[in-house]
A protein has these predicted regions:
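Polar/charged, compositionally biased leader and regulatory segments
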Residues: 2-87
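Catalytic cores of peptidoglycan-degrading enzymes
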Residues: 71-195
Length: 195
């Protein structure tokens, strides 16, 4: 992977080696069938919601908030890790693109970094209560399965501000926060910006 930086017409090139990782397999059994394979009656809803999420992640603003060190949005136990293969009731599904942080229902969720809210929805099919924040130049964070969404689209949020509460909405098996980080449509390991 090569990065090129140009400052005052001086070009600097940095090369980083991308290492191969081994990902966990996470098996979850005993789920209601609707949590594993959604009924056809909700396919249009899911497609519309996925398009809206994609649009919120595609924003390329001039904000510079991505430069600050991000903080953990909620205290709890990490119960799901980035990249783990999900097998639901024996059926392989997409890898997990975030970290799950198990916490008590109603626990306050802080903004991991300063930014502007680009999505604030109470009830998406898969992710339930969902907030997406733009931190600049394609970097966004997603907070999912919220019981309460306490911000609105367009709000400018400071790092550490309360944006919602932990819940178990959408396709969820218990109270937790699914926290994700993206660079446009590329999913990043949230631990890479938290450490």
């Amino acid at each position: 992977l090569t990065f090129t930086k140009i400052i005052d017409e001086k070009k600097s090139i940095t090369t980083k080696k991308v290492l191969k990782r081994k990902y966990n397999i996470q098996r979850i059994d005993g789920l209601a069938e609707s949590k594993v394979t959604p009924p056809e009656s909700v396919y249009k809803r899911i497609k519309k919601e996925n398009n809206a999420i994609g649009e919120a992640r595609a924003i390329n603003s001039d904000l510079q908030f991505f430069k600050e060190k991000f903080i953990m949005p909620v205290e709890g136990i990490i119960s799901g890790v980035y990249g783990s293969q999900r097998i639901l009731n024996g059926k392989p599904r997409w890898p997990h693109y975030g970290i799950d942080i198990a916490a008590k229902q109603g626990t306050m969720i802080k903004s991991s970094g300063s930014g502007v809210v680009t999505m604030a929805e109470d009830d998406l099919y898969y992710t339930g209560g969902t907030v997406i924040m733009d931190h600049g130049h394609g970097i966004s964070t997603i907070y999912s399965h919220l019981e309460n969404v306490l911000v609105s689209v367009g709000d400018q949020i400071n790092q550490g501000d309360i944006i919602g509460t932990v819940g178990s909405t959408g396709r969820s098996t218990g109270p937790h926060l699914d926290f994700r980080v993206n660079w446009f449509q590329t999913r990043l390991d949230p631990m890479s910006v938290l450490n």
